[in-house]
Amino acid sequence: MLILISPAKTLDYQSPLATTRYTQPELLEYSQQLIGIARKLTAPQIGKLMSISDKLADLNATRFHDWHPDFTPQNARQAILAFKGDVYTGLQAETLTEDDFDFAQRHLRMLSGLYGVLRPLDLMQPYRLEMGIRLENPRGKDLYQFWGETITEKLNQALQAQGDDIVINLVSDEYFKSVKTQKLQGQLIKPVFLDEKNGKFKVISFYAKKARGLMSRYIIENRLTQPEQLKAFNSEGYFFDAEASEKGELVFKRHEQ
């Protein structure tokens, strides 16, 4: 099965590395095109485009300027260890074993506005370029038009290489829109995580994001190969609710903490 997760805005280029192994991103020629476009933007334009503070706009203008495609362990970091948002809090990649990284390299992909598709050990330089940003480019008005079918084609290659047609969709809607589902040669399964609040179960963003990371780790650590095995997921109090689930959607609930 192929697990899809979102990237994160928060990055970590300081912590000790859990592995020294690395690979190179496979779509860097596309990244270079986007960097070329982004470099033409002033810091105030970046701030407006991304709805971020002046300080963050300055940081990202500098990142775009400093970015260059010769990635080494000295100027870049493995994607799975560089991202540090809520999903990655659940994933805790810094405690994975070398065997876990091997499995993840075959079965986990991160979608990215700048890099398209990243494998866990792919090096990346720091950036901020969310998939939903309306960055005009030669292919259209936003990143969805820029990436077109490229991301889907890369996922199809990954599916073929890892041996089955199961796709576990743990990405946000913003990133999943970059996947052309009609062209995807896989069967989609979407885990949904509901937390109890005041007696009602609903999606609570922070918990749901972390749960996507927990589920990713559960699949990696247990080397899962069948969708049926996902139903045993019970990290941090979640349990499978068969009645609330339907074809293609597995619902997990957790009682109020």
UniProtKB/Swiss-Prot annotation:
- A Pfam family annotated for this chain is H2O2_YaaD
Q: Which domain of life is it from?
A: Bacteria
Which biological processes are named by the entry's GO terms?
Answer: response to hydroperoxide
InterPro entries in the record, alphabetically? YaaA (IPR005583)
Which terms in the GO cellular component ontology are assigned? cytosol
Where is the chain membrane-spanning? none
Instruction: Please report which protein family the annotation says this sequence is part of.
Output: Belongs to the UPF0246 family.
PANTHER family on file: PEROXIDE STRESS RESISTANCE PROTEIN YAAA (PTHR30283:SF4), PEROXIDE STRESS RESPONSE PROTEIN YAAA (PTHR30283)
Give the protein's recorded name.
UPF0246 protein KPK_4750
Instruction: Please report the organism this UniProt entry assigns to the protein.
Output: Klebsiella pneumoniae (strain 342)
Lineage runs:
Bacteria, Pseudomonadati, Pseudomonadota, Gammaproteobacteria, Enterobacterales
